[in-house]
């Protein structure tokens, strides 16, 4: 499933500190085209900080970030906007604007990056709503009128508004029941397959790691300690990794795998 001939995101020697606390220390990481990379680590290890740094939402002390072949520190403002428009982000709690409808939330990236008539934006937003499995009448609802699962899907629709190449997911299944989480996993795989997405997924969800990730990267002590396939994670002798994947809470099977997802992954 992973196209290793094409690296679309390369992080080299990234360091980030907040005051005296060194969060990331010369960290290196690659993401390949059309892969789903699961990103894990202890709480407070800097997983979300790295994602925010890649997105330009947090300042780095040093290092190089190359996205779609471009060093983001050396591109023009116009090129950076083009790169930003080719990335979609689903934040942990959705981050929908409460005063806007689902339709209006999805249109926000379109308004920022595109010059489109309102009618066309309405049509495109409705297509994204259907793409993530929401009913069309969800378009007129406000976030307060949605369930947790619907909020996740609406936020995902917004992340997909500009047909990105690279999708960032921050704890996408947190707060969902097992059935809803399994359906969300299935949706991510379907979107990767149909849209050719590359997915960077911060998660603590063992079921998601087992079910949909091509590779897993483990952050600890400010760097990538281990990265590889699920099988390689199970063979890893690192104490934290072994406890995570083989401890009492670890799942040895795919209990949340739906028939549709099983068929797609086979």
Residue spans of the language-model regions?
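The feature captures the beta-strand-to-loop junction immediately N-terminal to the Walker
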Residues: 40-42
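Helix-to-loop junction immediately C-terminal to a conserved catalytic motif
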Residues: 55
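Conserved ABC ATPase "signature" region
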Residues: 71, 118-137
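Conserved ABC ATPase signature
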Residues: 142-146, 150
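A short, proline-enriched helix->beta-strand linker immediately N-terminal to the Walker B motif
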Residues: 161-165
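Catalytic Walker B motif of ABC-type/P-loop ATPase nucleotide-binding domains
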Residues: 167-170
